[in-house]
């Protein structure tokens, strides 16, 4: 049987780089070399300079390509490096259509950087396919999706957007950071470029900064590789190894965290101090049916809204287990405040249009015991002053 005959959870451990061919080592070797000797003037090897490629980076790139069902993977120094390099496929005068509630770093890249180079943009609610259709312009070249979106967990109908894109000869990019190929495989649904902040669930231990891109079309892969090599924001070999190590436990981490996320979302929904919960695993989430159709789970990230910033401050000071920090997707639960963290680059009026209020918190659930997390949040919520609890 070939590697592709196994389920993804088995492929995470038993892939093409299960053992080193020259030594039998069961861990991918870390090749700390900036340059590579060529055996003769007329016989150059596969590798020449480490910006262009290394055996360790190749192992990660080939592994993520296989997991996503693509033909080529590319590893970058961060998630934003991967996204920025993908946007280099655009030229002056092109237009990109972007999901409205997008990660703050992507928002900044589009509004403050791409616009300086004559690349136009429009933000639309991609949970509404009619808005997507209406947002298409004659110069639209890329439709950029996040699903679930960050931080309000909006769900986009991937196949619906892909169909619109094909009708207008557009490429589709999708940030798959929240779900990973363990729960969602966008290339199988027709997406052209899948992007990841591998800093998050793929590596899973808050100890590496990394980005990945995967494509199915070989010509597009060649174009992206040329941009990767030219732009130069590549991933170092030590970090490649850390991501490869993290991938081995992706399935078990994500399964555990997703189950706890559902339990916490259900608990938070019933607590009187919580105004609203955003989690696509809840049956009353507006995108729940689409999520079940295109993904095998709802993931381990949820958001919830309290009365105001004062309530947020009290809760953050009151919980014990989650770390209060930027980022997500780690073994430890991470509580974040989008208004001052992931979406700090977004003006307040733009945030509020997207439902990112001063009372919104995002929780990336870790692998702790679910009952312990529930008890921790309960005691913190129960201690909120009456004036900070929604009275409606």
Where do the protein language model's features map onto the residues?
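PLP-dependent enzyme catalytic core of the Aspartate aminotransferase-like
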Residues: 120, 138, 253, 310, ...
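Short, well-ordered beta-strand elements within core beta-sheets of diverse protein domains
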Residues: 243-252, 299-307, 362-366
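N-terminal "arm"/small-domain region of PLP-dependent enzymes with the aminotransferase-like
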Residues: 2-54, 60-63
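A common structural junction motif
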Residues: 231-232, 319-329, 380-389
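Conserved N-terminal alpha-helix of the aminotransferase class I/II PLP-enzyme fold
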Residues: 35-84, 89, 105-112
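Conserved PLP-enzyme active-site core in the AAT-like
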Residues: 2, 18, 74-273, 278, ...
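C-terminal core of ALDH-fold dehydrogenases
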Residues: 11-26, 310-350
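Conserved small-domain helix->loop->beta segment predominantly found in fold-type I
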Residues: 262-320, 324-326, 346-352, 392
């Amino acid at each position: 049987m070939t590697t592709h005959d196994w389920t993804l959870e088995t492929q995470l451990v038993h892939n093409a780089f299960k053992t080193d061919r020259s030594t039998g080592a069961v861990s991918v070797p870390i090749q700390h070399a900036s340059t590579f000797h060529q055996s003769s003037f007329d016989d150059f090897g596969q590798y020449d300079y480490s910006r262009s490629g290394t055996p360790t980076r190749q192992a990660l790139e080939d592994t993520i390509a296989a997991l996503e069902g693509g033909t080529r993977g590319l590893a970058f120094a961060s998630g934003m490096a991967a996204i920025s390099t993908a946007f280099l496929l655009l030229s002056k005068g092109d237009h990109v259509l972007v999901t409205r509630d997008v990660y703050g770093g992507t928002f900044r890249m589009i509004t403050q950087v791409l616009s300086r180079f004559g690349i136009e943009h429009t933000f639309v609610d991609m949970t509404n396919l009619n808005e997507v259709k209406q947002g298409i312009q004659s110069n639209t070249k890329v439709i950029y999706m996040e699903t679930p979106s960050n931080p309000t967990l909006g769900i986009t109908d991937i196949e619906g957007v892909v169909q619109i894109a094909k009708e207008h000869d557009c490429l589709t990019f999708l940030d798959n950071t929240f779900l990973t190929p363990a729960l969602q495989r966008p290339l199988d649904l027709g997406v052209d470029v899948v992007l990841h902040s591998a800093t998050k669930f793929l590596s899973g231990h808050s100890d590496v900064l990394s980005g990945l891109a995967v494509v199915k079309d070989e010509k597009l892969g060649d174009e992206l590789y040329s941009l990767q090599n030219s732009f130069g924001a590549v991933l170092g070999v030590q970090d490649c190894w850390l991501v490869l190590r993290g991938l081995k436990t992706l399935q078990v981490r994500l399964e555990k965290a997703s189950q706890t996320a559902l339990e916490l979302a259900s608990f938070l929904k019933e607590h009187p101090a919580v105004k609203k919960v955003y989690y696509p695993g809840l049956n009353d989430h507006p995108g729940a049916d689409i999520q079940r159709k295109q993904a095998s789970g709802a993931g381990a990230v949820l958001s919830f809204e309290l009365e105001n910033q004062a309530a947020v401050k009290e809760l953050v000071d009151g919980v014990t287990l989650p770390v209060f920090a930027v980022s997500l997707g780690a073994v430890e639960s991470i509580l974040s405040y989008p208004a001052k963290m992931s979406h700090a680059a977004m003006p307040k009026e733009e945030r509020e249009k997207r439902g990112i209020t001063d009372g919104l918190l995002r929780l990336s659930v870790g692998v702790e015991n679910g009952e312990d997390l529930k008890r921790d949040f309960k005691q913190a919520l129960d201690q909120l002053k009456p004036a900070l609890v929604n009275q409606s």
